């Protein structure tokens, strides 16, 4: 009886892991979404508003990245999100979020630079996973 219980638990664990993995379909969908976000975000406010969506996509793909890729992007995100101040108080705990507030021109410049670099990093990763996707769209 103990062996059967252990086998069932192992099977459930294996099935759960396989079902929660980042599938190729999800990667392709996120790849298309990142490309769309980057292509349609023309003004500063749109870029700032879409940072959270890029972070959400990154959080979905992060477990399937190589450790060095993940560490590089995590350092980049931490460098730009740890110092975010909301109503004069640093943000604390929970998922990283960019809060939409009235930003000074300097802060807006930093935020749009963050958007551009994060989007380019994600697009580069997707291009390495799906090298034909980019070339097919250009033809």
Curated annotation (Swiss-Prot):
Pfam families in alphabetical order: Turandot (PF07240)
UniProt keyword annotations, A-Z: Immunity, Innate immunity, Secreted, Signal
Localization per record: Secreted
GO BP term (any one): cellular response to heat
A cellular-component GO term for this protein: extracellular space
InterPro entries: Turandot
Coiled coil regions in record: none
Keyword Secreted recorded: yes
Claim: Secreted is one of the keywords in the record: yes
Main localisation: secreted
Signal sequence extent: 1-21
Domain of life: Eukaryota
Role summary: A humoral factor that may play a role in stress tolerance.
UniProt similarity note: Belongs to the Turandot family.
Record-given protein name: Protein Turandot B
Source organism per UniProt: Drosophila sechellia
